[in-house]
Amino acid sequence: MGNALRFLYGHCCKPTVEDHYQPPHGYGVSTATVGVSALAHDLFHFENTSQIPEGLTKYVVSSKKAQTNWYKKLSQAWREAKPPPQTAEQATRLIILTLKRHQKADVKGLLRFYGLPLSNNPSTEATTVVAPPQADQGVKFELHTLPVDVKAVADGDTVTVYVNTEDPREASNLPKSVKVAAQERAKARAVRDYVKADALQKNIVDAGYRVLSGPNNEDILARKYRIRLRGIDSPESSMPFGKEAKEELIKLVVGKCLTVHIYEEDRYGRSVGDIYCNGQFIQEKMLKKGLAWHYTAYDKRPQLSKWEEKARAARVGLWASSNPEKPWEWRKNKRNGK
């Protein structure tokens, strides 16, 4: 992964766009730059997974094999750009120059997919989506994860993610002992000393890291984060709709790279954050599906209450019941032996 792509992705990838270019719910991004962020996100995702974005086929005429070829070229062009594109005009120019030998219909479709201008004299119509004052207050840092494993989803509001330690933030915080252990593990595996390799992996895991296999079977040293979705509370696994909530979160995040805004750490050591994936705000999706409550004891954002109210009115998910048990009351009763 090139540093230039990492920098822009980490710098400006806020909630992006859903299928693919729709203004993202007033979280402070502008239509002049959100397409650049979405493109950076998708190139980052492609380099980690070799997957092209969902929904692109509806905008272009060429096959998925051809689309994969475009993303290989665009990834290379982005890495080599100095500086990388930071405006819609610059992103448009990079796409047009990189794909100049390809069909015009495909190039135009790709630009439309990202909401980018179709010429190099754009953005006079760009408008800014006004963010609610509290939208990003208190964000301590931002994570860009590796693809999520199905076993990482604990329930409807908790997921374990891993972040590549080549990420600039992680690289600066990586303990030397963990880095050395990963290097020694690779050497042990190379000579088939799996006993030593497994022991080193255990040391790495105990330190909060893990060596994962990349898409080309390369080793990726990654840091582990347990994420508690901020502002929602889903039914516990043994409660009605607990299974459905977990399955919905699996459907939304598994196999995908996430952007996570971290606000704090809870008493269980989990990082409390907002999760975005492929242009979707995950808490919004869970609330609208009727698979979570707005956790008002810890979150006062009015938009989350509106999404819950919408699901209640439609009687979807757990709101099909006239009086569903609240998970925080269920947990309290369990603690009290009721």
Curated annotation (Swiss-Prot):
Gene3D superfamilies: 2.40.50.90
Residue ranges of the TM segments: none
Molecular-function GO terms, alphabetical: endonuclease activity; nucleic acid binding
Listed InterPro entries: SNase_OB-fold_sf, Staphylococal_nuclease_OB-fold, Thermonucl_AS
Disulfide pattern: none
Entry annotation: catalytic residues: 228, 236, 270
Nuclease listed as a keyword: yes
Keywords: Endonuclease, Hydrolase, Nuclease
Boundaries of every TNase-like domain copy: 144-321
Protein name: Uncharacterized 38.1 kDa protein
Native organism taxonomy: Eukaryota, Viridiplantae, Streptophyta, Embryophyta, Tracheophyta
